[in-house]
Amino acid sequence: MSNNEVMKLEEDKELKGEFKELCKALRNNHRINPNLYVEYDVKRGLRDSAGKGVLTGLTEVSDVTGYNLINGRNIPAEGRLYYQGINVNDIVDSLKDRKFGFEETVYLLMFGHLPNKTELEHFLDVMFELQELSGRFVRDVVMKASNENIMNAMQRCVLTLYSYDENPDDISPENVLRQALELIAKLPLIAVYSYHSYRHFRKDEMLFIRNPEKGLSLAENILLMLRPKGEYTELEAKVLDIALVLHAEHGGGNNSTFTTHVVTSSGTDTYSSVAASIGSLKGPRHGGANLKVQNMFDDIKAHVKNWGNEEEVGAYLHKILNKEAFDHSGLIYGMGHAVYTLSDPREVILKRFAKALAEEKGRMKEFALYELVESLAGKMIKEQRNLQKNVCANVDFYSGFVYSMLGIPQELFTPIFAIARMPGWSAHRLEELTNANKIIRPAYKYVGHHTEFETMEERSAEKITDEDVKEELEKCKKEEKGKK
């Protein structure tokens, strides 16, 4: 190691020490007494004490329901999800007679009704034309500064597209619609190409860039562009299409869509709004949860010998809940939802397709483990936390398993979610621009103390605290005793 490298290491150590000291001061300064949140009835996470979301807006884009209102009381019910008033179960059931439904779902969310044959054909033609990324953009933006976290790469690319737009700041409905459709069309290419760039430049693997093909669904094109030989089975494409449909939209209150509303209300451009929503979705408490589920199951498989033994699996789940195993968070990922109580309709549907795919891939033993954990975890969480509300599996529970069976790398788990959710964000952005004329600005109460400004000389002077006085008094007492 050279002298310069040794000096750099020493400087880094010194800097880390400085940050450690600064963080001590930061923690002491920023810690708020938790009792104050109760005293001032703060709706933490914009939820009431029962976990129900505070009403902050209205929407016609989708409806998320986990209760039935009976005699003025909310009674837990099987979960229901509606896109523009149409039950998502009906959308999925309609795909038995047709191959793919994501593009039709995009049209429904954006324009409020299902397209007829002519409308759909025209829409598909438009979306294919909008897909194109120039060779210059791919070379100068996507391929530069490759990143292990594809969500960050997507944010960077989306923000850079602002510079390629001749009219980026116009927030008229016509212009925002154009921008939204372009981003819906381009985001899959950005995600897949960013992943290939990462593999090539960070892992020294072969680089291949394949263009999407006209006449294929988005699900088919993702698999085509992602795989070295571009091959896939009909069931693989079908299951990915279903996953995209189920992730396309989920109300205005989820974190990334609420981010869309908040940022849009400021009057900013579409690219900034979408980049902010991608940043929100990246978080492990939101879109990143599917990867957490996958990692948790890898841990369970490594520590439980008999995956079919209910007692052994249950014992390990208890360890996870007691913060004795996995990431020591005490969380069983993929379980529980802010709205759904008895079931998450997306999870119910995806589970059905996960089973079909597991049969094709010879991974039924793993599927059985997922089913067993699902059957045990909800009751265990409810019992341990003494909850009144039921705890059901959510869509993240099976989505990571599905993606792994499709050969989708973990780096693309959350980007696939972002690709799917882009039409939902777009519909909500247009709804916010059309109906709202106020910037979203909730209240925060100051609970600190007011103090006098001190000059530099006063700040530099040695401060005598109450603790210092106590210590000095104790010292004096000891000295007096010694004299006696």
Where are these regions (language model features)?
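Non-transmembrane, aqueous-exposed alpha-helical and coiled segments at domain scale
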Residues: 2-484
